[in-house]
């Protein structure tokens, strides 16, 4: 190569470039990093200097292979020293070749610089000696950097200066050896220079480890010698060489640029920096790594070489440090880019290491504090959380911290509370609950205001005791039937904070809900004792006692407003809790057994699955079935009302007060989102029912009837889905207009006002179902669907039948309810087959709902609805006309007729219905032929 360089520079350059490209490619294949072309390397190649440097580098690589073991072995022989140095050279060379990928620009630059310096030296001195010298010089540039860095690594790894001393000795010996071998002043000088640089690096690390001023002086002298030697030709070499060096070496490069003391000072400063980093090296591998990688440009293959050699030497010297160094080595490529910030990063790493150590110890408390802060941000739960945290910390600082950390993680991921330490978390939450009950947020206060203060206080006290007693508190909670509801209240309160605090508190709430579920299950026996009390009024009383459902009827009434206020505190919980409240109310309304309600409440949070909800609904169904039919209808009404109230914006709010509802809401949040489509259908159903309030006129009871039937029937899952969908919609942020807004968003046909009106009307209807037919009238009036109580009563008498009819409008639940009301549905499905009479298709909302539900039904048919005629597609005017002869439908038609007259002329809706006909036939049902005939009888819609 030297001959080529001297005789055929062009060919030499070409070969050099090819070799560089090949080496870069090999490095890339090796996977170090993506090689980048180094301008300096190219320039050096152009100069042809690289050739010898690389030849020497290859030789040094060979030496390095033998010396890498020697490096780890130590300072035993000048040969080893020389190998160490050559190993550094070879490491740099090798890494110039291999580490090119990671340090390619640096490696090649150093290679180029080393070769350039070496060949400059060669050009200045005999080429033959200069080859060795170039080798020492070139590798003195590269290998010295590499060796220094390697030695620095080794020394930093050793953090004891042993590798430093070894490398220093090796370097010193190698200086002698090099001098002897080269016999050239340049060789000697370059070797000492090279030694001085590795020595400087070693000295740097020695400074780091041993802080030997001797090393610094020696390295400085070597640096000076090198600087002097390379004053003209070595400057480039040292610049390239030292720039690859790190900050200290960069300083040397600067010193080289500013030869003399400055370079020494820079080297010493760099060494001092290295010393500091080495001091911290064992502690701060990242700092060392950063120091190792001074710059992308400063770093050179030697960095990788250092890493590798360092690993080998550390294997021999300090495996532990080797591991740390390896970690640092892993960091090197990254930190190499940060090399310029090495000093700052070193300090930053030191501070970070210290901070990390402190943070590790303080992390749990910080997490708790974060939660506390989040809770405090919640405002409502601020004092509660503070007190709860204080009490919980006082009583279980250690475990509270762990659960808090767990909860933070969980809260972030919103995993089940089960993920966190149940016992300690339960205790923590119990304490928080107890304090939450004591500090009862407005939700709890509302419930307390509802006359539950004594029990709330009692529950709060019991919860506090539980907090104090830990799991015993849980047992006590389970022992107290009201505690589970109360704890739910606490959870409700806490969910309020959760709503504000966000996922963390939600995780806490979820976890505590799981606890509540267990407690409620335990309370189940106690609640069973109160089953008999589950009479419709007593169920309400039980709710009041439980602090959960006392507000349900009230929720429908003024209690709902209070709960709304409480819920306002928990906006996040509004949607989730709203849906939960719907389900919860269903549960608790069906709560002939409070335990079942609690269980089901807990079940939903436990499983957070529609399955859970379905299961809970099934349990509710069982409870409903177990309870008297009157209670069942009442509970069903309330359930429906709760569900629909959840659908409506009020529902989520007043139900947000229900902690189990929060559980359900969270459980459903996951599913509710997935079941958004169902929710939309539910919305359609709700809106349809709202628009179809004729069917719903008495159908608060009808709703209760078919909802009960749904629950009793196989529709439990559907209802759960409906509730889930309602949840999803609430979660969607449709503030109770969820159904309407969802339908509106989905269809865009219904105006938000109409949707809201429908939702509110339906809510009113539901509330009226709970409160009486007068509410139905209100609903109908509000909807503009003027339905007389007689009609309502007629429909009430026909509830079962009309429920299917109404259910038919409901894509999910109403149809399912129809299916759920087997006898009624089957007996009346012919009449209800075409709910046109019940559905005021003339009302745009009804038509929108019909079209919407029909299209959705087509998109995803529900076999549960098969038994139910497709009211949504059925609504064409012919259907109402054809079916109005049916007596029930006649009465319904009478009811609708006023609505039609109020809203539109009877004839007007027909074209609109015809427009809706384009939707399709919908699901197969027994009345398909009738529907088809009715449609055929009608003129084609324009």
UniProtKB/Swiss-Prot annotation:
Superkingdom of source: Eukaryota
Membrane spanning stretches: none
Chain spans, region Disordered: 66-212, 240-269, 283-487, 501-607, 671-942
Compositional bias of kind Acidic residues: 353-370, 415-425, 709-721
Biased composition (Basic and acidic residues): 106-123, 132-143, 240-252, 312-330, 338-352, 384-397, 444-458, 466-475, 514-531, 672-687
UniProt feature, compositional bias: Low complexity: 837-853
An annotated GO BP: cholesterol metabolic process
Biased composition regions of type Basic residues, renumbered to the chain: 854-863
Keywords: Atherosclerosis, Cell membrane, Cholesterol metabolism, Chylomicron, LDL, Lipid metabolism, Lipid transport, Lipoprotein, Membrane, Phosphoprotein, Receptor, Steroid metabolism, Sterol metabolism, Transport, VLDL
Subcellular location: Cell membrane
Main location per the UniProt record: membrane
Membrane topology: Peripheral membrane protein
Tissue expression as described in the entry: Highly expressed in spleen, lung and skeletal muscle, and weakly in brain, heart, kidney, and testis.
GO cellular component terms, A-Z: chylomicron; low-density lipoprotein particle; plasma membrane; very-low-density lipoprotein particle
Function of the molecule: Macrophage receptor that binds to the apolipoprotein B48 (APOB) of dietary triglyceride (TG)-rich lipoproteins (TRL) or to a like domain of APOB in hypertriglyceridemic very low density lipoprotein (HTG-VLDL). Binds and internalizes TRL when out of the context of the macrophage. May provide essential lipids to reticuloendothelial cells. Could also be involved in foam cell formation with elevated TRL and remnant lipoprotein (RLP). Mediates the rapid high-affinity uptake of chylomicrons (CM), HTG-VLDL, and trypsinized (tryp) VLDL devoid of APOE in vitro in macrophages.
Protein's name in the database: Apolipoprotein B receptor
Higher taxonomy: Eukaryota, Metazoa, Chordata, Craniata, Vertebrata
Gene name for this UniProt entry: Apobr
């Amino acid at each position: 190569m030297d001959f080529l360089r001297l005789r055929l520079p062009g060919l030499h350059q070409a070969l050099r470039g090819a070799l560089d490209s090949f080496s870069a490619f090999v490095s890339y294949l090796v996977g170090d990093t993506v090689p980048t072309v180094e301008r300096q390397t190219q320039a050096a190649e152009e100069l042809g200097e690289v050739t010898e440097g690389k030849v020497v580098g290859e030789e040094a690589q060979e030496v390095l292979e033998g010396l890498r073991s020697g490096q780890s072995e130590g300072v035993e022989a000048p040969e080893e020293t020389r190998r160490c140095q050559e190993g550094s050279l070879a490491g740099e060379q090798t890494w110039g070749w291999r580490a090119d990928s990671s340090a390619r620009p640096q490696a090649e630059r150093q290679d180029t610089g080393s070769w350039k310096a070496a060949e400059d030296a060669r050009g200045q001195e005999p080429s033959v000696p200069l080859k060795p010298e170039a080798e020492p010089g070139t590798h003195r540039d590269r290998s010295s950097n590499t060796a220094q860095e390697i030695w620095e690594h080794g020394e930093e790894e050793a953090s004891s200066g042993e590798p430093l001393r070894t490398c220093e000795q090796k370097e010193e010996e190698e200086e002698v050896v090099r001098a002897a071998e080269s016999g050239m002043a340049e060789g000697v000088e370059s070797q000492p220079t090279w030694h001085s640089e590795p020595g400087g690096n070693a000295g740097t690390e020695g400074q780091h480890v041993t802080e030997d001023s001797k090393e610094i002086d020696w390295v400085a002298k070597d640096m000076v010698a090198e600087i002097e030697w390379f004053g003209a030709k070595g400057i480039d070499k040292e610049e390239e060489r030292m720039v690859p060096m790190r900050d200290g070496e960069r300083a040397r490069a600067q010193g080289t640029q500013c030869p003399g003391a400055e370079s020494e000072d820079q080297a010493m400063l760099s060494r001092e920096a290295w010393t500091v980093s080495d001091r911290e090296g064992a502690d701060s591998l990242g700092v060392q790594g950063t120091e190792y990688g001074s710059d992308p440009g400063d770093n050179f293959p030697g960095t990788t070489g250092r890493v590798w050699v360092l690993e080998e030497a550390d294997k021999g010297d300090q495996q532990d440090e080797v591991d740390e160094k390896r970690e640092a080595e892993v960091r090197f490529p990254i930190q190499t880019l940060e090399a310029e910030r090495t000093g700052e990063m070193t300090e930053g790493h030191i501070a970070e290491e210290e901070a990390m150590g402190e943070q590790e110890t303080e992390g749990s408390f910080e997490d708790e504090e974060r939660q506390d802060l989040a809770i405090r941000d919640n405002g409502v739960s601020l004092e509660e959380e503070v007190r709860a945290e204080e009490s919980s910390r006082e009583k279980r600082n250690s475990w509270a911290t762990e659960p808090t950390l767990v909860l933070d993680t969980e809260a972030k991921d919103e995993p089940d509370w089960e993920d966190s330490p149940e016992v300690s978390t339960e205790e923590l939450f119990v304490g928080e609950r107890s304090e939450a009950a004591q500090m009862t947020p407005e939700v709890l206060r509302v419930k307390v205001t509802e006359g539950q203060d004594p029990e709330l206080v009692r529950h709060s006290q019991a919860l506090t005791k539980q907090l104090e007693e830990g799991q015993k508190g849980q047992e006590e909670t389970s022992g107290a039937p009201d505690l589970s509801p109360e704890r739910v209240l606490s959870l409700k309160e806490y969910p309020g904070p959760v709503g504000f605090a966000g996922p963390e508190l939600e995780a806490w709430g979820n976890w505590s809900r799981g606890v509540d579920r267990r407690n409620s299950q335990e309370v189940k026996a106690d609640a069973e004792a109160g089953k008999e009390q589950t009479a419709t009024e007593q169920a309400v009383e039980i709710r009041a006692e439980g602090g959960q459902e006392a507000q349900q009827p009230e929720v429908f009434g003024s209690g709902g407003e209070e709960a709304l206020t409480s819920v306002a505190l928990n906006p996040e919980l509004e949607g989730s809790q709203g849906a939960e409240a719907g389900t919860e109310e269903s549960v608790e309304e069906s709560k002939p057994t409070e335990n079942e309600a609690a269980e089901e409440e807990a079940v939903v949070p436990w499983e957070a699955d529609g399955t859970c909800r379905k299961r809970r609904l099934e349990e509710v169904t069982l409870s409903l079935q177990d309870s008297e039919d009157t209670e069942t209808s009442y509970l069903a009404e309330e359930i429906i009302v709760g569900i629909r109230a959840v659908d409506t914006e009020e529902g989520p709010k007043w139900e947000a007060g229900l902690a189990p509802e929060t559980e359900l809401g969270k459980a459903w949040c996951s599913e509710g989102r997935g079941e958004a489509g169902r929710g939309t259908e539910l919305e359609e159903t709700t809106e349809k029912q709202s628009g179809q309030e004729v069917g719903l006129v008495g159908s608060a009871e009808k709703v209760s009837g078919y909802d009960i039937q749904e629950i009793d029937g196989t529709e439990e899952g559907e209802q759960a889905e409906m509730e889930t969908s309602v949840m999803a919609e609430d979660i969607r942020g449709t503030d109770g207009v969820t159904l309407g807004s969802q339908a509106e968003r989905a269809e865009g046909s219904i105006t938000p006002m109409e949707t809201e009106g429908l939702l509110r009307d339906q809510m009113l209807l539901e509330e009226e179902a709970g409160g009486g037919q007068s509410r139905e009238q209100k609903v109908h009036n509000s909807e503009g669907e003027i339905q007389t109580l007689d009609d309502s009563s007629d429909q009430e008498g026909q509830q079962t039948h009309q429920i299917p009819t109404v259910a038919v409008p409901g894509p999910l639940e109403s149809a399912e309810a129809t299916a759920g009301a087997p006898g009624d549905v089957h007996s009346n499905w012919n009449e209800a087959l075409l709910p046109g009479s019940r559905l005021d298709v003339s009302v745009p909302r009804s038509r929108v709902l019909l079209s919407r539900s029909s299209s959705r039904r087509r998109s995803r048919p529900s076999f549960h609805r098969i038994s139910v005629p497709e009211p949504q597609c059925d609504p064409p005017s012919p259907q109402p006309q054809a079916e109005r002869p049916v007596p029930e439908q006649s009465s319904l038609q009478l009811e609708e007729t006023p609505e039609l007259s109020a809203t539109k002329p009877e004839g007007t809706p027909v074209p609109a219905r015809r427009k809706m006909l384009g939707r399709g036939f919908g699901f197969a049902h027994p009345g398909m032929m009738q529907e088809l005939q009715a449609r055929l009888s009608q003129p084609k819609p324009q």
